UniProtKB/Swiss-Prot annotation:
Residue span of region Disordered: 500-556
Residues with attached carbohydrate: N163, N212, N338, N510, N523, N528, N533
Pfam families in UniProt: SPRY (PF00622)
Keywords: Endosome, Glycoprotein, Membrane, Protein transport, Signal-anchor, Transmembrane, Transmembrane helix, Transport, Vacuole
Keyword Glycosyltransferase: no
Name of the gene encoding the protein in the UniProt record: SSH4
Name assigned to this protein: Protein SSH4
Organism in which the protein naturally occurs: Vanderwaltozyma polyspora (strain ATCC 22028 / DSM 70294 / BCRC 21397 / CBS 2163 / NBRC 10782 / NRRL Y-8283 / UCD 57-17) (Kluyveromyces polysporus)
Amino acid sequence: MMIIEGDISGQEAVKNVIYGTFLPVDDPYPVTPPIDHDNETVSLAFLISLSVTFALLMILLVATAAYVMFCGADEAEYDEETGEGSSSSVTGIHTFFGKKGGGILLDSTFCSPGQFDDEEALREQEEQELPKMSKFEIELYKRSREFQNLNPPLVKEFGTYLNTSDRQFIKDRGIQSYYFYPSINDNVDKYGNFLPSFLVQDKLDVTFTEYNKSSSTLLNYPLPFNKKEAVYFEVKIFKFPTNSNTIFSIGLVTCPYPYFRIPGMSRYSIAYESTGKLRINNPFGASTLLPRLQEGDVVGFGYRYKMGTVFITHNGKKMMDVTHNVGVDLFVGLGALNASYTRTYTKDGLLEDPDNVDIREALSQGREVELPDAIQKVYDPENLTPVAADEVELQVNLGQVGFVFIEANVKKYGFGSVLGEIGIPPAYNGDEIKRNAIIQKGEEMPPKYGFEEGDRNSFFGDIHIYEGHHQLEAEELPEGNGGVTTTQDAGARAATDYERVSSAFDRENNDTTKDPADEILHNQTAANTTKPNKTSNNNNKNHNNKKRNKRNKRRK
C-alpha cells in the first residue's frame, strides 16, 4: 500500500485506496475509471423474466381452476362397509369452493344414486334378506319405508334447517337449549295405560325401559356450527347389563326419522350399534367393524366442517373416518330394540352371522353355545305375556363437561357455551351487592321484639294474657283497699263481672231446658191472676145491693 504525502493523513489515504476514490496527485494525466452500466441492465432483464414467469403461472392456475370447476371429477368414493369403491362426478362451483351441495357422502351406501333408488336391486335384496327376518322385523321395515315415503327426509345444505329465532335462542341459552324428544304415546296396555318406551331425564339422559320394543329419539336441534374445526359429542353407556336382550345404537340421522326405528336402519342415517356393527342406511346384514359396547364405554361422534367428515371414537380413541363430503343437517339420534322379537339377534340369526367368531369356534369344537333365555328363540310381540327388555341408560355430553377424547377438549369441539350469552341469574346474596344502595336489604329477620313489661313501644305493644283491654281501665280506677289496686286484680274483677252478667242474660233468654207448651201455660196463668174477673165483680155487687135493700126495709 502506498502512503500519500501531503495534507492527507495516512489513515485517510488507506480509506481512499480501499474505497477506490483516491487519485494520485502527481499523475499529470489522471485517468478516470470507467463507469459500469451492466448492473442496471441485469436488473431490468431479471424483472422482465420474473414478470413473464408469474404471468405464465397465473395462466396455468386459471386453466387448472377452470378444468377442475367444469371438467374435473371428484375422487373415487369408498364404501366403509363393503370395501367397494365407485366414482361419481359432481360438477359445479360449489365443489371448487369446498361446499358439499352436490354430494352428500363419498360413502356409496348413504345417498348416492343407484343404491336405494334402484328398485330392481332393492327388490332382489329384499327377496334375499326378508325371509331371514322375523314377523316383527318385517313389519318395522315396511312401516319405515312407508313412513319415509310419506315424510321424505330433509336433505338440505348444512346450516339451513334453523330459522333466525332458533339461532338466537341457541345463542342465548347455549347447550341448555338442547334436549331429546319424549316417547311417543303408541305403547299402551289393555287398560289403556301409557307404557313409555324410554324416559328423558335432565334433557340429555335417556333410559330405555322394559316396555320398549323398538324406538328412537332425536335431539331437538341439528349439529351446530361452533366456529371451530369440528363439532363433537359423546355418549356414555351408564347402564347396560351383560348378555342383554336389548340392542341399542348411537348415531346421526336426518329429520324426520321413524320414531320406531333405531338409527342406521333407515335412509340417511349412520350409527354405531352395540353389537359392534357400523350401519349406514342398512336395514339388512351389516359388518362388524367396531368393538362391542359394554357398560362404562364412551362412544363419540364428530363432524368436520371443511371436508364434511364424520368420525367415530371409542373410549377417547379415534376409530375411523366413516364418511366424507357430508353437507346436510344431521341430528343426534339414540335408539334401542328388543332383540327377543327379532330373528337377527336371536340364536338362529347369530349362528348365521359370519362376524360371530366366538359362536363359530364353539360350534367347530363341539361345545354348546350358551345364550340368555331371552334370545334363545323368537318371541311374538302380540302375545299376552310380553318379554321385558333390559333397561339401558345413556348419558349424552354435548360439551357441558369434559370429553374423554382429548382433541375435542383442546380444540373445544363442544356444541357451544354451556350457559349461552345470557348466562345464569345473578347471585343476590353475594358480597358485590352489599355496596349497591338500590338493592340493599333491611334488617335480618326476625326483628328484635321488646319483651320488657310495660313497654308499649314494642312490636305488639304491652299485652298480657287473660287481661286484654281491661288493663287500661284498671289503671284509671281510683285507689282502694288501703290505696293498693293492682292491674291483675282489676282485670280479674272485670272478667268476673262480665261472666255474671252474661250468665244471667243466658238464663233469661237462652234457657233451652224449658218446654214450649209449659211456657205458654205459665204465661196464661200469670195473665189470669193479674187480670180482674168481671163475673165475680158483678156477683159481689148484686149481693151488696140485696143487703142494702134489707136494711132499708127494716128501718121503715
